[in-house]
């Protein structure tokens, strides 16, 4: 059995098979008719895709452009799904969309190209032995962005502020949280996130608490940002 949903079915006149006491009819598809009926669905998906894709190509901010290309790729997948069904109905007519397929297949390379121009300077407050700084640097690099050493070189500044959220004494407890904001050179905020440690860390000195908490906290930051960057950019 096929799981393909049949479209624009037509049927022959039914006939009665006396021996089985059943009616039978043959189902068939006229490809031209089926294509004519299904084509508007393809065109709707095409229009939706190019609305996002064209807007992305006109966006001046690099990160926003990456994000919009990512959205256009998601829309493009819907377009491709409808084309695949259209190919079943009429492969010759579907072949007329080959240039659109090329446009969609080229989007990942476009995104990577834009990312390589997204230079990022990381400015962080409240870190311990640069543990979170290193984690943020790795996330940006692994996501395709380029981290630079000075703000003058950067197209974007990643401002990060860590709050320890100290409570108690002897032992004291900390439960770090971080606020992250990415601004472009025009002071426009492009990305924000707030990440909190999943548990408190107890110790008899602040330094020992930080030493224990920050490696685990940096892993939490890395995992969440890696996922969010992959989804958005």
Predicted regions and their residues:
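Mid-chain, structured segments of secreted extracytoplasmic proteins
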Residues: 1-25
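A short beta-strand signature
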Residues: 173-184
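Solvent-exposed, acidic/flexible segments
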Residues: 42, 125-133, 173, 203-214, ...
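A short, structured loop/turn motif at beta-sheet edges
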Residues: 151-156, 182-189
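Short secondary-structure boundary motifs at beta->alpha junctions and helix caps
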Residues: 184-229
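Short, solvent-exposed beta-strand/turn "edge" segments of beta-rich domains on protein surfaces
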Residues: 18, 167-171
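A structural "domain/chain start" motif
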Residues: 16-19, 23-138, 230-233
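A short, hydrophobic beta-strand-centered structural micro-motif
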Residues: 3-11, 120, 147-168
């Amino acid at each position: 059995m096929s799981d393909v949903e049949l479209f624009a079915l037509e049927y022959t006149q039914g006939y009665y098979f006396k021996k089985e006491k059943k009616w039978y009819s043959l189902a068939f598809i006229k490809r031209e008719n089926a294509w004519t009926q299904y084509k508007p669905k393809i065109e709707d998906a095409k229009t939706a895709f190019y609305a996002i894709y064209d807007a992305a190509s006109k966006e001046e901010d690099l990160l926003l452009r990456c994000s919009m290309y990512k959205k256009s790729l998601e829309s493009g997948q819907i377009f491709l799904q409808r084309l695949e069904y259209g190919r079943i109905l009429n492969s010759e007519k579907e072949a007329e969309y080959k240039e659109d397929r090329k446009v969609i297949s080229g989007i990942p390379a476009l995104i990577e190209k834009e990312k390589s121009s997204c230079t990022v300077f990381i400015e962080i407050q409240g870190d311990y032995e640069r543990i979170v700084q290193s984690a943020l640097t790795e996330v940006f690099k692994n996501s395709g962005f380029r981290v630079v050493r000075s703000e003058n070189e950067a197209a974007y500044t990643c401002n990060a502020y860590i709050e320890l959220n100290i409570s108690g004494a002897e032992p004291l407890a900390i439960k770090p949280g971080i606020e992250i904001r990415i601004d472009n050179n025009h002071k426009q905020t492009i990305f924000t996130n707030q990440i909190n440690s999943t548990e408190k860390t107890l110790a008899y000195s602040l330094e020992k608490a930080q030493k224990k908490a920050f490696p685990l906290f940096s892993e939490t930051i890395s995992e969440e940002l890696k996922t969010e960057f992959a989804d958005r950019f």
